[in-house]
């Protein structure tokens, strides 16, 4: 964290004198913390800083599809929270072919097992290849949404200012993207359990921010 903060701070210091209408797409981990570092260093508006966090949602969709034995293209789902261990899968918002479905406890546990163990299982294959292309595809979608001013909604880490009840912290949420960056932050209704998990994610991110500010 400290090393990445120092690198990002050095880069951002060179942006201060440039036109302030640009949008920054951040893929440096821990992305939620680094988003705030970027804003502190550049002074840009929060809607001009977009953190890459889409892979958590992709893994959730893939896991749901595997557990239900269907194609992943039929699944609509999303993760909120930290881009990392404290990601919050919204089981209350799982859709198959645009129809809401409820997973039972066994299915939820199986989905969580898939999402939490995918990396270790991939490493065990020793394929000599990378799964990093998925990040490239998702980053391209963010760029395309900005370049075309499409208004597409994508999962991103966004600095909040009252949304979901939080301020001055960057968290993964669905955001509408356009030419100026983030045009709208979508606030989803959460279950009590999901809200509690999101609170835990925010607490962890705040703690990491505090550790590099002391």
Predicted regions, residues:
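Rossmann-like NAD(P)(H) cofactor-binding subdomain of soluble oxidoreductases
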Residues: 1-61
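C-terminal substrate-binding/catalytic lobe of Rossmann-fold NAD(P)-dependent dehydrogenases
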Residues: 41-50, 56-214
């Amino acid at each position: 964290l400290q090393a990445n903060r120092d690198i990002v701070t050095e880069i951002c210091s060179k942006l201060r004198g440039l036109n302030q209408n640009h949008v920054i797409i951040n893929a440096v981990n821990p992305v939620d913390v680094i988003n705030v570092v970027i804003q502190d260093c550049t002074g840009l508006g929060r809607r001009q800083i977009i953190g890459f966090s889409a892979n958590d949602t992709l893994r959730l969709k893939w896991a749901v599809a595997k557990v239900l034995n269907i194609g992943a293209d039929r699944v609509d789902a999303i993760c909120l929270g930290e881009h990392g261990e404290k990601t919050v899968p919204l089981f209350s918002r799982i859709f198959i072919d645009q129809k809401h479905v409820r997973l039972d406890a066994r299915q939820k546990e199986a989905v969580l097992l898939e999402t939490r163990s995918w990396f270790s299982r991939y490493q065990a294959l020793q394929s000599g290849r990378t799964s990093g292309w998925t990040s490239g595809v998702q980053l391209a979608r963010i760029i395309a949404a900005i370049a075309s001013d499409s208004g597409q909604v994508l999962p991103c880490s966004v600095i909040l200012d009252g949304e979901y009840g939080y301020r001055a912290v960057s968290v993964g949420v669905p955001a509408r993207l356009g030419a100026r960056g983030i045009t709208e932050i979508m606030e989803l209704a959460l279950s009590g359990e999901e809200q509690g998990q999101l609170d835990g994610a925010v607490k962890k991110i705040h703690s990491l921010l505090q550790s590099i500010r002391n």
